């Protein structure tokens, strides 16, 4: 059930994932599906959208990178502190029972991809997860993904410090050229990674679902800050998960974002 108004919840636990990435666990459920996001609120600071890393009906997790003013303040919070949450918002990843899926995760996109893999294997899907990061020290959710039965984990790092040396999209492409096949791609990560996944999807005629990120304020489609050109899609309600046949029509996909007042 969607919680449309900010409600404060206590942080049940804090996990330090990397030097700049943390995971908060809350003893609450928003009824979220993989790919959806919530609005995270700190009174007197700001409210920002974040992908939901896990929601099993009892616990909810968010994983975030402390990069801006809001997330740096959030990173100071400890177990027992209060944080405002509302949601879930947006579209989610979808699949059919028994499909062979390639899940591509770049950076902290590994968090929602773990949630996706966790749910997809319940439908007897053959799940391959391609996790990419700059280096071994930046990899996320490797242990969690590796522990899921029914998941084949592929790791890629830009510097070759762990797994395949290069981009996870290149790793996927090489496997496909070698004869591997998939029914669908699901991806979350930096937009240039998504652009590359989109290209393979179009070339090989394999459907894909991509999670696009834009500046979001309301979550209701009212403010228009997350609108993408030229279709007028509001990513907070028509996305963030978009099918590739729609993505290829978006002129700013892989090119530019609008800022907090809508400027290119």
Language-model segments: residues:
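Structural signal for conserved beta-strand scaffold positions within catalytic alpha/beta enzyme cores
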Residues: 13, 54, 155-157, 210, ...
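Short, Lys/Arg- and Gly-enriched loop/turn segments at beta-strand edges
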Residues: 46-53, 90-99, 236
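FNR/FR-type flavoprotein reductase catalytic core
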Residues: 69-215
């Amino acid at each position: 059930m969607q919680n449309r108004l900010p409600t404060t919840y206590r942080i049940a636990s804090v996990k330090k994932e990397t030097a700049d990435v943390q995971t908060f666990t809350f003893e609450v459920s928003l009824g979220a599906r993989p790919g959806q996001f919530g609005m995270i609120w700190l009174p007197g600071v700001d409210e920002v959208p974040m992908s939901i890393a896990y929601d099993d009906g009892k616990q909810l997790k968010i994983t975030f990178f402390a990069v801006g003013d809001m997330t740096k303040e959030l990173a100071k919070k400890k177990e027992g502190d209060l944080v405002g949450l509302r949601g879930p918002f947006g579209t989610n990843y979808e699949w059919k029972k028994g499909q062979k899926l390639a899940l591509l995760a770049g950076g902290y996109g590994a968090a929602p991809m773990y949630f996706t893999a966790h749910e997809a294997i319940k439908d007897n899907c053959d799940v391959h997860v391609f996790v990419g990061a700059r280096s071994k020290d930046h990899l996320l959710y490797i242990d969690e993904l590796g522990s899921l039965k029914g998941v084949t984990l592929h790791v890629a790092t830009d510097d070759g410090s762990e797994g395949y040396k290069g981009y996870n999209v290149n790793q996927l492409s090489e496997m496909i050229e070698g004869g591997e096949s998939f029914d669908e791609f699901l991806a979350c990560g930096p937009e240039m990674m998504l652009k590359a996944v989109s290209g393979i999807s179009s070339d090989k005629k394999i459907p894909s679902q991509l999670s696009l990120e834009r500046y979001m304020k309301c979550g209701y489609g009212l403010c228009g800050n997350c609108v993408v050109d030229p279709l007028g899609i509001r990513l907070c309600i028509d996305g963030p998960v978009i099918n590739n046949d729609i993505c290829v029509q978006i002129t700013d996909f892989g090119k530019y974002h609008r800022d907090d007042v809508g400027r290119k």
